[in-house]
Amino acid sequence: MSVLTSLLLRGLTGSARWLPVPRAKVHSMPPEVELGIMEKAIGLTSCFVSLFLPAGWILSHLEDYKRPE
């Protein structure tokens, strides 16, 4: 890296060092009611189905997309 490039980069990032970073005031507490095994299983199953079912459908019909009509 040339001297000019390093000076230019230092000049561009120098002013950003003094900007205040906003901090989120988020405080968390333990849940009032623990999730049961069945609720966790239903949640994970619905996440997997919603992600993998459309992807599987597209992959299984990939040849249909390749055919010229």
Curated annotation (Swiss-Prot):
Modification(s) after translation: In response to mitochondrial stress, the precursor protein is ubiquitinated by the SIFI complex in the cytoplasm before mitochondrial import, leading to its degradation. Within the SIFI complex, UBR4 initiates ubiquitin chain that are further elongated or branched by KCMF1.
UniProt motif SIFI-degron: location: 2-19
Annotated Gene Ontology cellular component terms: mitochondrial inner membrane; respiratory chain complex IV
GO biological process: mitochondrial electron transport, cytochrome c to oxygen
UniProt keyword Ubl conjugation, yes or no: yes
Residue numbers on the Mitochondrial matrix membrane side: 26-36
Cell compartments where the protein resides: Mitochondrion inner membrane
Record-annotated membrane-spanning stretches: 37-60
Functional pathway: Energy metabolism; oxidative phosphorylation
Swiss-Prot/TrEMBL keywords: Membrane, Mitochondrion, Mitochondrion inner membrane, Transit peptide, Transmembrane, Transmembrane helix, Ubl conjugation
CDD domains registered for this protein in UniProt: Cyt_c_Oxidase_VIII
Residue interval of the organelle targeting sequence: 1-25
Bilayer topology term: Single-pass membrane protein
Mitochondrial intermembrane side: 61-69
Domain of life: Eukaryota
Known role: Component of the cytochrome c oxidase, the last enzyme in the mitochondrial electron transport chain which drives oxidative phosphorylation. The respiratory chain contains 3 multisubunit complexes succinate dehydrogenase (complex II, CII), ubiquinol-cytochrome c oxidoreductase (cytochrome b-c1 complex, complex III, CIII) and cytochrome c oxidase (complex IV, CIV), that cooperate to transfer electrons derived from NADH and succinate to molecular oxygen, creating an electrochemical gradient over the inner membrane that drives transmembrane transport and the ATP synthase.
Assigned protein family: Belongs to the cytochrome c oxidase VIII family.
Known partners and oligomeric status: Component of the cytochrome c oxidase (complex IV, CIV), a multisubunit enzyme composed of 14 subunits. The complex is composed of a catalytic core of 3 subunits MT-CO1, MT-CO2 and MT-CO3, encoded in the mitochondrial DNA, and 11 supernumerary subunits COX4I, COX5A, COX5B, COX6A, COX6B, COX6C, COX7A, COX7B, COX7C, COX8 and NDUFA4, which are encoded in the nuclear genome.
Name this polypeptide is given: Cytochrome c oxidase subunit 8A, mitochondrial
Organism field: Macaca silenus (Lion-tailed macaque)
